[in-house]
Amino acid sequence: MANIHSTNRPILVVGGGISGITAALEAAEAGYHVVLIEKSPYLGGRVAQLYHYFPKLCPPQCGLEINFRRMKQNPRIRFLTMAELASISGREGDYVVTIKLLPRYVNERCTCCGKCAEVCETEIDNPFNYGMDRIKAAYLPHGFAFPMRYVLDPSIVETEEGKKCRDVCEYNAIDLELKETAIELKVGAIVWAAGWDPYDASKVEYYGFGNYRNVITNVMMERLAAPNGPTRGKIVRPSDGECVKNVAFIQCAGSRDENHLLYCSGICCLASMKHATYITEQHQDCNVTIFFIDIRALDRLEDFYTKVKTNEKVTFVKSKIAMITEEEETGDLMLEGENTNTGEQIRMKFDMVVLATGMVPNRINVDPAPDVSCDEYGFMVHDPEKCGIYGAGCVRRPVDVATSVQDATASALKAIQSIVRR
């Protein structure tokens, strides 16, 4: 059993995705107190939204559930959801941070009976499914959310709808009087594990995302395939619910582009290959075409690339697609571009197009900003001269889940060193 190290300066971990959870657990199990904050109503981050993830292509529920159990059993971890970092001051070993707490309007008495959702008539876009379906404004974030507790959308709090939700709850779990608050903490080190956002595909105007319903992004594809997704795992066209028969993937949609993201996000190629297997396993008569600039499939995952290439239903075409147009009557999509290898002009029709958008790091957005080093793309860079605040996972570079876990462990050790030095 780890010794408990006496200090009134816990480690603050910002971000409750797989990197933040890992950093918090590693530090706490080494005997240090940790405060973990997450801006959404649940822990698990982007990994919770995956259907399968590398390297074993298994669902995320098992791995996350084990980590949640470890967290619940460890008294040295305190976690806060719907919490955001508002300010940082001080230096290594002696920081003062302000944390903004947004109201959930549902307290610890919630039993997830769902009666509030039953009486609620207002619907909102489902953030967990990237807006591909609608949910009640009194909702459980998703089926294995941690903490397992409902949330009220602010839009109904001051309405009769909110009062109906409150009145139907026999456990007095709904409090419509809750307000935004702030707390101040003294911490010894900070692990910034705030993760990433998908690049806004609507900025790549010539691909029509947001205007053409059958143009979706890679993160949306992940939700389409998931059993707890908007279609209960059925991979169908968003416009009409028809089974897909001919799907295109466009790699580097907004990446390696001087008008958008200059860098490669590294894992998008493998993600699209994974999605291609989702489709061909579910629809054996469906053809998949992957349009790419270069394929990135490094180390042991190259074997997965080799396996996908042998699938007769999957075709790789070296091309940067120039434009997508839609047939209004059918919703079919016409892709135009050039085959880089042959110089041949491409004009092909598809049922659905998936854009492989890049990963954009979530930066530390407080005023005044702390003295941390970032590269020209906004990814945090470790500077030995600037200790005390450490990046973990995808805020440092685009990486997969396994690499994020390794990186978060290293960041936790760095944070411990900052406390020990003081």
Across the structure, where does each feature detected by a protein language model lie?
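Residues forming the flavin
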Residues: 1-422
